Amino acid sequence: LKCHNKLVPFLSKTCPEGKNLCYKMTLMKMPKIPIKRGCTDACPKSSLLVKVVCCNKDKCN
């Protein structure tokens, strides 16, 4: 699986073994602007301020 791991969408990395989800964190007030991206083994929960989206296809975040 390859996930974007920087704020610019054209940079990606291959996820390590066991981390088979990509995630993207955005601020609830500014959903178009990612604040963090990367690989994860379990999808982090969204909070009042931060929305988290997870997916399992290459570069889907």
UniProtKB/Swiss-Prot annotation:
It comes from Hemachatus haemachatus (Rinkhals). One of its GO terms (cellular component) is extracellular region. The keyword Heme does not apply. It is found in: Secreted. It holds the Pfam family Toxin_cobra-type. Its main location: secreted. This protein lyses red blood cells and has cardiotoxic and hypotensive activities. Belongs to the three-finger toxin family. Short-chain subfamily. Type IB cytotoxin sub-subfamily. This is Three-finger hemachatoxin. Disulfide bonds join 3-22, 15-39, 43-54, 55-60. The keyword Transport does not apply. Expressed by the venom gland. Is classified as a P-type cytotoxin, since a proline residue stands at position 31 (Pro-31 in standard classification). Keywords: Cardiotoxin, Cytolysis, Disulfide bond, Hemolysis, Hypotensive agent, Secreted, Toxin. One of its GO terms (molecular function) is toxin activity. One of its GO terms (biological process) is killing of cells of another organism. CDD domains: TFP_snake_toxin.
